[in-house]
Swiss-Prot record:
PANTHER family: UBIQUITIN LIGASE SPECIFICITY FACTOR/HREP PROTEIN, UBIQUITIN-BINDING SDF UBIQUITIN LIGASE COMPLEX SUBUNIT. Belongs to the WD repeat MET30/SCONB/SCON-2 family. GO terms for biological process: protein ubiquitination. WD repeats lie at residues 320-359, 361-399, 400-437, 439-480, 544-589, 592-629, 632-663. Component of the SCF(sconB) E3 ubiquitin ligase complex. Residues 1-80, 503-547 are annotated as: Disordered. Residues 195-241 form the F-box domain. This is Probable E3 ubiquitin ligase complex SCF subunit sconB. It comes from Arthroderma benhamiae (strain ATCC MYA-4681 / CBS 112371) (Trichophyton mentagrophytes). Pathway: Protein modification; protein ubiquitination.
Length: 663
C-alpha cells in the first residue's frame, strides 16, 4: 500500500506540469483546483476500500512485457478492481468468476438512473466509431509506457464510474481546458450527440412522427439514410398524406388535390392500418390484386392539382354539331353532347373523333345524362327518350309533360324531370309509376335527386330553389335570394367542407324577391336578366326560418339521412350562391361574370361556371375568388362539366372545348 501511495503525488505533479504548459492559470486558481481534486482522489469511495488509493501506474519492469489495449489496462486491473466491483459488479464479476463476492458492497437499486447510452445492465446502442478508435490506438502507441499506463488507467476509471462520478471528472477536465481544447471538444461532441431517433423508435411511433411532415419535408427526410427512406416512403405515411389532401383542402398548407376513382380495395386499406399499428399481416390476408403505392398516387394527384392551380392544360375542340350545344356530360373515355340541331353525339375523348349520332327527337335537346348502359335525353318536343348509346338504339320514349323538357336527373330507380309547364315529374323505372310535384310558378330549369335522403332539389324562373320529399311529394323548404331566374341548382358532395366565417351570417339584403315579367325572354327561351321591371323589393321580408317539416323529417329519431349540407345555385343575376341547406342561409355570393350564368359544375375543391359573357370561370369555394377564367368560345357558354382532371364547356358557337389537366 505504501508503494501505491507513493506514486500518486508524482503522477499529480506530472499532470499539473502538463496543464501549466498548456494553459496559464493564476496561483490562486491552481491552488483552488488542487484542493478540489485531491480530496476526490483520497476518498475511500475512489479507492474502492477504506484507506486505500488506486495506483496510476506500476513500475515499468512489471508491465513492459505485457500487451496493452486501448480500454483494457491489465497492470492496473488489480488496483482498480474494488472500484470496478463496486460500480459495475455484474460486469466485473463475469471477468473474475472465481473472485469472492463482498456482501458489504452496496447493491444497485432497481430504480437506479443511468443515461440510456451507458446503462450497465443494457447493451449500449451507440457503437464506437472504428476509425476514431484506431486513430486513438495509434496515437497512444507513440507515447511512453508511463504515459500509456496513465491514460489507459484514467480511461478505465472513467469507464467504470457511475454517472455522478463521470460528471465530476468531466467538470474537472473542462475547467482545465484552454480554448483550442474546448474548440476540439465542441467539434467532437457535435456529431456524437446526434441521435437517430427515427431508427431507434418503434416503427409505429416513427410513422406517427413522419405523418406530421409536409411533402417537401417528407422528401427531405427520405434523403437522410436508407432506413429513413424506407420509413418515409412507406404506404402508412403516404396514405395519411393522401387522406389529408385528396378531395379536400388541407387546413395547414391550403392545398387540395383532386380525387381519383375509389377503386382501391378495402383489404389494402386494412393492410395500411395494420402496418401503422405495428402488427404483422398474415399471408392469407394479402390482396389478390396489386395496387399502386400511395406515394405514386399522391405524386399523380399532386401534378394534376398543380396544373389546376397554375392553369396548365391541353385543349381539345370537338366540332360536328350544326347548331349551339345545350348540354353535355363525359366520363373517362366518352363525351356526350346535345344540341339545338336535335341530335346527340357520342365522342371518343382520346381521339376527339365522333363515334355515333343519336337521332329521334324533333326539337332542341335541352338535357341529357348517361351511365354505363343507357343515355336519357330531354327535348323541347316534350318527350324523354332512353337510348342504348353504345348501339344508337332508342329503347323507350316517355311522354307526359305539357311543355318542353328543360332538365332531368336519374339514379338507379328514379328519374326526375323539369319542364316549361312549371312542374316536376318523378318517374319510377321499376313499376312505371309517376308523380307530379307542383309549386313552382314558372319554368323549372334544373332538378337534382339525392338518393340517400329521398329528396329532389329544383331551380326555377320564379327566382326560388326548392327541396321536395320524394315519398310524399311535398315541398320541404323554399330558398329565396337570387334576383334573377335561377338556372342551376347543385347539391354538393357530403365530403365538401366549408369553414364558416362570422360574415356568413344570414344576409337579409340577399333575401329579396323581384317582380316577374312574362314578356322578357333570353336567347335560350328564358327571360332576360336585363328586364326593366326586375328591381329589388327592399321591403320584402327575408325567407322564413326552416320549416317544421324539414326538422320533422330529418331528425335522429326518424333515422332518415339528411340532405347534403350545402348546395350551389347559379342565376341570371350574374352570381353564384353557396347555401346551407338545413338553415336556409346564403353563406357566400360569387361575383365575377358580367352576364347571366347558364352552366354550373362542382366538386369538393372547385366550382366551374359558364355564362352569357362567353367565359367559363373556376372558383375557390372557400375564399370566393375566381381562380381562373377560360375564354375562346365565340358564343355564350351554355353548359359545363367537371371531373378530377378535366373540364368541358359547350357553347352556342356549336363547339365543345375539353381542357385536360393531366400530367
Amino acid at each position: 500500500m505504501d508503494a501505491d501511495n507513493s506514486t500518486l503525488p508524482t503522477e499529480q505533479s506530472a499532470v499539473r506540469e502538463t496543464c501549466d504548459r498548456d494553459v496559464t492559470m493564476s496561483p490562486r486558481k491552481r491552488r483552488r483546483l488542487s484542493v478540489s481534486l485531491e480530496p476526490e482522489l483520497t476518498e475511500p469511495e475512489a479507492a474502492g476500500t477504506p484507506g486505500e488509493r488506486c495506483s496510476t501506474a506500476d513500475t515499468p519492469e512489471s508491465t513492459a512485457s505485457e500487451p496493452r489495449s486501448l480500454f483494457n489496462s491489465t497492470p492496473t486491473e488489480g488496483n482498480i478492481a474494488p472500484f470496478l466491483t463496486k460500480h459495475i459488479k455484474d460486469q466485473h464479476a463475469s471477468r473474475n468468476r472465481f473472485a469472492p463476492i463482498d456482501s458489504s458492497l452496496p447493491r444497485r437499486k432497481a430504480d437506479s438512473k443511468y443515461c440510456y447510452r451507458h446503462r450497465p445492465d443494457l447493451k449500449c446502442r451507440r457503437q464506437a466509431v472504428e476509425p476514431t478508435v484506431d486513430q486513438m490506438q495509434r496515437d497512444l502507441s507513440t507515447l511512453s509506457q508511463n504515459d500509456q499506463q496513465s491514460i489507459a488507467h484514467f480511461w478505465s476509471l472513467f469507464s467504470a464510474a457511475p454517472s455522478k462520478h463521470r460528471n465530476l471528472m468531466l467538470q474537472g477536465i473542462v475547467a482545465q481546458c484552454c480554448f483550442p481544447q474546448l474548440s476540439f471538444l465542441s467539434a467532437s461532441v457535435r456529431d456524437l450527440i446526434r441521435i437517430d431517433f427515427v431508427t431507434a423508435l418503434p416503427p409505429e411511433i416513427s410513422f406517427k412522427i413522419l405523418s406530421y411532415l409536409d411533402t417537401a419535408s417528407l422528401c427531405s427526410a427520405a434523403q437522410v439514410s436508407h432506413s429513413w427512406r424506407a420509413l418515409a416512403d412507406d404506404d402508412v405515411v403516404w396514405h395519411r398524406m393522401c387522406e389529408q389532401h385528396i378531395d379536400r383542402k388541407c387546413e395547414k398548407c391550403g392545398w387540395g388535390l383532386p380525387m381519383l376513382d375509389r377503386k382501391r380495395l378495402k383489404d389494402t386499406k386494412r393492410q395500411v392500418q395494420l402496418r401503422a399499428a405495428g402488427k404483422e399481416i398474415a399471408p392469407n390476408q394479402r390482396p389478390q390484386q396489386q395496387h399502386r403505392p400511395w406515394k405514386a398516387v399522391y405524386m399523380d394527384r399532386f401534378k394534376v392539382g398543380t396544373n389546376w392551380k397554375y392553369g396548365r392544360c391541353t385543349t381539345t375542340i370537338f366540332r360536328g354539331h350544326t347548331n349551339g350545344v345545350m348540354c353535355l356530360q363525359f366520363d373517362d373515355n366518352i363525351l356526350a353532347t346535345g344540341s339545338y340541331d336535335a341530335t346527340i353525339k357520342i365522342w371518343d375523348i382520346e381521339t376527339g373523333k365522333e363515334i355515333r349520332t343519336l337521332r329521334g327527337h324533333e326539337s332542341t335537346i335541352r338535357c341529357l345524362q348517361f351511365d354505363d348502359t343507357k343515355l336519357i335525353s330531354g327535348s323541347l318536343d316534350r318527350t324523354i327518350k332512353v337510348w342504348n348509346w353504345r348501339s344508337g338504339e332508342c329503347i323507350s320514349t316517355y311522354t307526359g309533360h305539357q311543355g318542353g323538357v328543360l332538365c332531368l336527373h336519374f339514379d338507379s330507380t328514379t328519374l326526375a324531370s323539369g319542364s316549361k309547364d312549371n312542374t316536376i315529374k318523378i318517374w319510377n323505372f321499376h313499376d312505371k309509376s309517376t308523380r307530379i310535384l307542383r309549386g313552382h310558378a314558372d319554368w323549372v330549369n334544373s332538378v337534382k335527386l339525392d338518393t340517400a335522403s329521398r329528396t329532389v332539389f329544383s331551380a326555377s324562373d320564379d327566382l326560388t330553389v326548392r327541396i321536395w320529399d320524394l315519398d310524399t311529394g311535398k315541398c320541404i323548404h323554399s330558398y329565396a335570394g337570387h334576383v334573377g331566374q335561377v338556372q342551376q341548382v347543385l347539391p354538393l358532395p357530403r365530403e365538401f367542407e366549408f369553414k364558416h366565417q362570422s360574415n356568413c351570417a344570414d344576409d337579409r339584403s340577399d333575401r329579396l324577391s323581384g317582380s316577374e315579367s312574362p314578356d322578357h325572354r333570353g336567347s335560350h327561351g328564358y327571360r332576360s336578366n336585363n328586364a326593366p321591371d326586375q328591381q329589388p323589393n327592399t321591403s320584402a321580408p327575408p325567407t322564413e326560418p326552416m320549416s317544421p317539416l324539414f326538422e320533422a323529417l330529418f331528425t335522429e329519431d326518424q333515422g332518415r339521412p339528411a340532405p347534403p349540407r350545402y348546395m350551389l345555385t347559379a342565376a341570371l343575376d350574374l352570381t353564384l350562391r353557396l347555401w346551407e341547406v338545413h338553415t336556409g342561409r346564403c353563406l357566400r355570393t360569387f361575383f365575377g361574370h358580367i352576364e347571366g350564368v347558364w352552366g354550373l359544375a362542382a366538386d369538393t375543391l372547385r366550382f366551374v361556371s359558364g355564362a352569357q359573357d362567353h367565359m367559363a370561370k373556376v372558383w375557390d369555394p372557400r375564399t370566393g375568388t375566381c381562380e381562373r377564367t377560360f375564354t375562346g368560345h365565340r358564343g355564350p357558354v351554355t353548359c359545363v362539366s367537371l371531373s378530377d382532371s378535366r373540364m368541358a364547356t359547350g357553347s352556342e358557337d356549336s363547339e365543345v372545348r375539353m381542357y385536360s389537366f393531366k400530367a
